[in-house]
Every structure is written in C-alpha cells, then in structure tokens.
C-alpha cells in the first residue's frame, strides 16, 4: 500500500457549498434494481429529494429515490482503514455505495444520482447505432 500527501488541493474543494449534486455510473446494483430506464438517487435532505421528484414528474425524466439505509453502514467498517469502499454483501450495493459517498459530505444538502451509462433501445431524441 502506498500513501500520498496531497499538496495541491483544487480551489473548488475549498468552497463552502450550499448544495452538492453528483451523478455517476457508480454501481451495477442500481441498474439491477431499477432497470435500464429509471435512475436511482439518494439524498440526505428529504425536502430536497421531494423537489427533485417533483421536477422529475414535471419534466418526464424518471427518477426513483432509494434509501440511505444506515443499518448497512457497518458493512463499510474496516480493521485497516477508517472505512472501505464496498460492502460485505452481494446485496444492497447501490445503498452501500451511496453510504460510502455520504461519508465525504458534511452538513450540506446532497443528492447522489446513480445512473446507467447506456441505453438498450433507440428512442425519440436518443442516439442511434452506438452505446456510450
């Protein structure tokens, strides 16, 4: 194992954010749970989550909230580090991944969208011929 002392923090990391929204193709577990058309999201702020759900319904862009189920957070415990980045179980991977990310969010409203990076069907206004 190698340790690194990071001496050049980007200025954006020093900002005091009012809101954090991250979007990532983080887990296959979300795709298994939600299928190929509905991204899941997690939030530490219920009011913010409801606003996102409302916007999703108004725009026709589907989203579905999954829980930050704290009972799974013990799966991230490690004897050799503060925590690890993957749970002990082959189940609940989207939740444990979001719980991992949440460890880096302080007292800031936060949304994590775990989305699938490609589509299986050509639809109106979608790219044709390839998958990204």
Regions found by a protein language model. Name each.
Residues 1-132:
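A generic structural signal for tightly packed, nonpolar segments enriched in small/aliphatic residues
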């Amino acid at each position: 194992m190698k340790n690194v002392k990071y001496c050049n923090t980007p200025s954006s990391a020093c900002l005091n954010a009012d809101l954090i929204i991250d979007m990532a193709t983080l887990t296959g577990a979300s795709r298994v749970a939600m299928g190929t058309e509905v991204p899941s999201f997690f939030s530490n702020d219920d009011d913010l989550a409801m606003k996102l759900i409302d916007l999703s319904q108004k725009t026709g862009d589907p989203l579905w909230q999954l829980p930050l189920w704290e009972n799974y957070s013990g799966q991230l415990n490690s004897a050799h580090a503060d925590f690890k980045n993957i749970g002990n179980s082959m189940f609940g991977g989207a939740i444990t991944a979001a719980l991992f990310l949440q460890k880096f969010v302080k007292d800031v409203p936060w949304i994590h969208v775990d989305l699938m990076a490609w589509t299986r069907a050509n639809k109106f206004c979608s790219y044709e011929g390839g998958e990204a």
